């Protein structure tokens, strides 16, 4: 079956977020020739995306399986553990979810994630090596991801992350935290958001 390069499906795990969200929003606004569909594991995410006025499907639904068979591009931000059979032959655009100097993917040598990571590379290595394009933000990150994820240089795309470069206004949730919490305009807010570490 020939895949349609004008149908792109997107996923960011169990939410509508991250680099896939920002590229999804950008393509919807600037490339009407491309059909965009947000793929979901859970009904609450699907319903949320639909309330925004966008097309969304559950992976395990008839509509989801049909669109997975037709789509030409699958946009993600991680090395997925599961590739549904309907995705065979699709081009994967991995936007990753950030940069950092920690060991990831193939270079994880301990902790509870090690076994899961090893299993997914045994199961999906052919897909990662042959069907996945990988976004990197700099020459330094090229080296990092080639080493950490085993990606060949010809599959790298050097560009900025969509969430950092897309400047279109997006109205997916209210952003005025002070107003939501009933705080004054000069109230100071502190955020503590550590990255998970297993070492």
Where are these regions (language model features)?
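Nucleotide-sugar donor-binding and catalytic loop/hinge architecture
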Residues: 1-5, 171-191
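Active-site and donor-binding regions of nucleotide-sugar-utilizing enzymes
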Residues: 7-171
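Acidic, glycine-rich loop-and-beta core segments that form the ion-binding/anion-interacting portion
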Residues: 196-197
């Amino acid at each position: 079956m020939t895949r349609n390069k004008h149908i792109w499906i997107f996923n960011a795990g169990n939410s509508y977020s991250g680099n896939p969200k920002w590229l999804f929003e950008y393509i919807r606004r600037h490339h009407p020739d491309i059909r965009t569909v947000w793929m979901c594991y859970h009904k609450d995410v699907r319903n949320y995306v639909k309330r925004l006025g966008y097309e969304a499907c559950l992976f395990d639904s008839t509509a989801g399986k049909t669109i997975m068979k037709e789509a030409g591009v699958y946009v993600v931000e991680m090395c997925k553990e599961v590739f549904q059979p309907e995705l065979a032959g699709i081009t994967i655009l991995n936007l990753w979810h950030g940069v950092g100097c920690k060991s990831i993917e193939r270079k994880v040598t301990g902790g509870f994630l090690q076994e899961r990571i090893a299993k997914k590379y045994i199961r999906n290595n052919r897909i990662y090596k042959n069907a996945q394009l990988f976004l990197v933000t700099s020459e330094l990150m090229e080296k990092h991801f080639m080493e950490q994820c085993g990606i060949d240089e010809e599959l790298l795309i050097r560009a900025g992350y969509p969430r950092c470069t897309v400047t279109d206004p997006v109205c997916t949730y209210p952003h005025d935290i002070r107003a939501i919490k009933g705080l004054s305009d000069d109230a100071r807010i502190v955020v503590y958001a550590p990255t998970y570490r297993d070492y």
